[in-house]
Amino acid sequence: MSSGTPTPTGAINRRGPFRPGERVQITDERGRITTITLAEGGEYHSHKGFLKHDDLIGAPEGTVIPNTHGILYQALRPLYKDFVLSMPRGAAVVYPKDAAQIIVKADIFPGARVVEAGVGSGALSIALLRAVGDYGCVHSFERREEFADVARGNIETMFGGPHPAWKLSIGDLQDTLPQVEEPGSVDRVVLDMLAPWECLDAVAEALAPGGVLICYIATVTQMSRLVEGMRLDGRFTEPECDETIVRGWHVEGLAVRPDHRMVAHTAFLVVARRLADGAVRLAPKRRASKTDFSEEDMNAWIPMNVGEREVTDKKIRRAARDAKNLAAHAARANEIALEQNGTAQNDAAAEPAESAE
């Protein structure tokens, strides 16, 4: 890469030796994984000795070192999938398997203008920011300020500081979106909320023709109501619905079999595209429905009426505090990385001058 090419946000703290303030994933010989934050003079203790952080600081990624009792540990930076499952959370996160599908199905491209509603703990926001890059825009909407605080801390931890492409608005999407985004100015909309059908009008106004709406929803009743709402709206293509199931495999010589556990249903994804103004939706021909349903039937089994478990304020405050502390450590690690990178570039620039002499 040319020295004149700007480094993308978050890239510099994914390279080089381990630095103070970084999150590091250590794995013992039995495959047990622990994520620690490196600190000068810090120690990781277990019932079988302790590991000094100073032995890792300055070491290359992928180092294997013993603790005081000779137990070996493998040290690596957490991948995205590891980070989002271990980061502080106030709300449930979008699992990596679903985040990957959202990026692909919604065709999130570099420079895209994306609206996201339902930030939660920021797991999906991180994936979206990585996809749009520094010159795109992810405009996130969240109703609860305390959830936004957790997401902000996690995003800054992942990228080593604020991301230039991230904007955050507090409030209901259907009320706030028309005030902050021009009609037809948004490329993609990602909804993770209990009642996405309530936002269809605001979303249709904001989306550019050909833009993509993708919704992450938990139950079949939500999916049914959303799909019927899209069809009645008339400004979207026929919705596509699916779920993603991931099954690992155990491989040891010729002993090859599926794992005993798998990541099965987490949510459904519903995808549709915005039609041009005035276009008539192509409705697929299908057999007449054998049974009708009422509004009462549709509302009976949505999470808000079944009794969705609420996250306590105490847990949210603790998650926000932890996320803020981790973000501060990550910012320090990023500063060290920038200093090291600047020194390396200066040394590289000085080499041609020395050889010329």
Language-model segments: residues:
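SAM/dcSAM-binding transferase cores
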Residues: 2-67, 84, 228-357
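Conserved SAM-binding loop and adjacent beta-strand
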Residues: 13-16, 86-99
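Conserved class I S-adenosyl-L-methionine
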Residues: 109-120
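Conserved SAM-binding loop of SAM-dependent methyltransferases across substrates and taxa
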Residues: 121-134
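A short glycine-rich, Lys/Arg-flanked "PGG" loop and its adjoining helix->strand segment in the class I
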Residues: 129, 197-209, 231
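Short beta-strand element of Class I
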Residues: 135-139
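S-adenosyl-L-methionine
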Residues: 141-191, 196
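Conserved beta-strand signature within the Rossmann-like core of class I S-adenosyl-L-methionine
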Residues: 210-218
